Amino acid sequence: MQSFTLMSLLIPIPRKQTYQTFFNVNSESEIQGVYQWHQDLAAEAFLILCDFEVIFRSKIHQAMASLNCYPNQDDWIVSSRQQQNLVNKLQRDMLSAQQAGKDFYPDARNYNLHSSFQLSGKDRQNFINLICEYIKKGKNSFTHDDLVASVSFGFWVSLLKRLEGLKHGSLITQYLTEIFPHSTKGFDLNHLKSILDTLNRIKSFRNRIGHHDSIMRIPEPIAGHPDFYPRTVNQMINSLKILLLSLLDLVRDIDPQCSLAIEQSKNWKSFFLLLKVDSFQVYRSNSGNLESYVICYLNNSYNTFDK
């Protein structure tokens, strides 16, 4: 009976050849091994990114509330005083469309969120769509935590991007000081541009993992030069290490305790356990089976103990 691996069943031949060429392997078992190493790395990285997103969005939410709302309020997206009026209007319009036998497609220009921060038209539309989804599920009210948890990571990056358009540099300083209180890099436009560069790299990395794309050639920033794209396993390892450490730097600027918690997490340790040439070779030699990770773990434990 012929044996099929997950890779042979799911991966198109051109993509399979990409892994084969980049990792310089030939046999089916070696290809399966390096592919599984790549997948395990991506899986651990994604969990780290999830932790980062929660920390990042929570801090921005707090900063926006602090700078745009009354004390002890967090309604910078939708005014709490106007929330019920907004829900009622949407409910009426949804009912009217239903009675007319039409689908309901709300136009955000017809609804006022009474936001205390100037959102883009796209963002307003996204929030109106979210509120409509809540209503369809029978919710007549919602919290700002609901909204914060529902929007994409890209929303928070674009929100910071909009700070570039602030007319007064002092406003940029206020926002950056609130969001990254432990930074020592200065709270000006150059600092903001540096943060956005890192965030866009993280977002691109996150999207590649989310779409099951490869993370072999994540670009490495080179000051004053175009990005460098890895061509070997060693270069790939170095590029991923730089990216994850830049993520950790952002978290440290937000809250050093959070960065320490990430460093001590199982996902962080597992990622860097795998992000080694030795681990790559173990997976390559063992077809990426379950024992591959166990061997990597035992090798690391032995080396740590030996030191």
Where is each model-derived feature located?
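Active-site-proximal loop/turn and secondary-structure-junction residues that shape catalytic pockets
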Residues: 215
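Extended intrinsically disordered or low-complexity regions, especially N/C-terminal cytosolic tails and loops
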Residues: 1-197, 201, 219-307
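Acidic/aromatic/glycine-rich contiguous surface patches that form carbohydrate-binding/processing clefts
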Residues: 212
